[in-house]
């Protein structure tokens, strides 16, 4: 996976997702996407301020607080936050950065792709997964 990967390829090569802006509110889009991705076999780690759990997964306050490989950083935040999140994703060793609908940043794209990360923006992980019939086949799922 690299800067030229398609959204479907990113999802296929992803197992662990750090979801920035995950919400414990079932009415929020991030909650529904997290629930869907977990049901499809992805491990989704909610990243947000505070403590507790979302869908049984403990909340982590930053990417730096995750002590396992991060395949994708999935972002439910405003576009203005994307460049700093891209820098954090690079520093955390993430393989891809995905900005959800409404989040668009050429600066974040440049930061991510120049560091070799795959990148998608202004598109929903749940929608791509459903439309492309892809699923995780990353390293943790291979024999």
Question: Each predicted region: which residue ranges?
Answer:
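A charged, well-structured terminal subsegment
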Residues: 128-143
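Active-site regions of enzymes building and remodeling cell-envelope glycoconjugates
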Residues: 56-63, 118
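NAD(P)-binding Rossmann-fold cofactor-contacting core
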Residues: 23-28, 34-54
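Short N-terminal or domain-adjacent regulatory/targeting segments
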Residues: 1-14
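Mid-chain, well-packed structural core segment of small domains
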Residues: 63-104
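Rossmann-fold NAD(P)-binding glycine/threonine-rich loop
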Residues: 101-128
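Conserved beta-strand elements of the Class I
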Residues: 17-18
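A short helix->loop->beta-strand "cap" motif at the edges of active sites that frequently abuts
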Residues: 40-42, 92-96, 115-117
């Amino acid at each position: 996976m690299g800067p030229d990967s398609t959204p479907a390829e990113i999802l296929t090569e992803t197992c662990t997702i750090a979801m920035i802006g995950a919400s414990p509110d079932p009415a929020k889009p991030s909650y529904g996407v997290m629930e869907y991705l977990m049901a499809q076999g992805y491990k989704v780690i909610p990243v947000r301020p505070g403590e507790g759990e979302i869908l049984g997964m403990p909340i982590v306050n930053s990417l730096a607080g995750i002590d396992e490989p991060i395949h994708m950083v999935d972002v439910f935040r405003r576009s203005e936050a994307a460049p700093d999140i891209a820098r954090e994703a690079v520093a955390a060793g993430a393989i891809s950065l995905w900005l959800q609908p409404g989040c668009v940043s050429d600066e974040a794209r440049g930061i991510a792709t120049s560091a070799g990360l795959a990148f998608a923006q202004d598109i929903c992980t749940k929608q791509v997964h459903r439309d492309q019939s892809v699923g995780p086949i990353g390293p943790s799922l291979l024999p």
